[in-house]
Every structure is written in C-alpha cells, then in structure tokens.
Amino acid sequence: MKIKVNGEEKKIELDQENALLSTALNYMGYKPNTVVVELNHLIINSMIWEKVKLKDGHNLEIVSIVGCG
C-alpha cells in the first residue's frame, strides 16, 4: 500500500485486513503516546486508531511531541 506521510510517499507492507492506523504507526516506529496524527486533514483521536483503516493514497501528517524543560 502507498500512502503519503509528512509529504513523502511511502510504501507500507500491510494487507487490507491489517491496514489499521495503529498497525501502520507501529510499523513505521512511532510510539502512540508521543504523536498526533492527521489523516486526510482531520485529526484522529488516538482512542480510535485501532478502528481506522488506511487505504492507498491516504495522506498522513504525524507530529511528534517532545518535552523539554
């Protein structure tokens, strides 16, 4: 499946059954409690990432949260 992540096209090896947002984020190495995800211009609540299916051509913007003191 090909999706756009932060403006760059990426090929992710997930079949349609496992093409969940949570699975894709894990595959790409993101930690769920440290990112905010926008899918096709809508911010997706992390509580439903396991229910959101990705499709070819979807656009993800992923912002990592970094704490500093």
Task: Briefly describe each language-model feature range.
Residues M1-C68:
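Ubiquitin-like/PB1-type beta-grasp interaction modules and other compact soluble beta-rich domains
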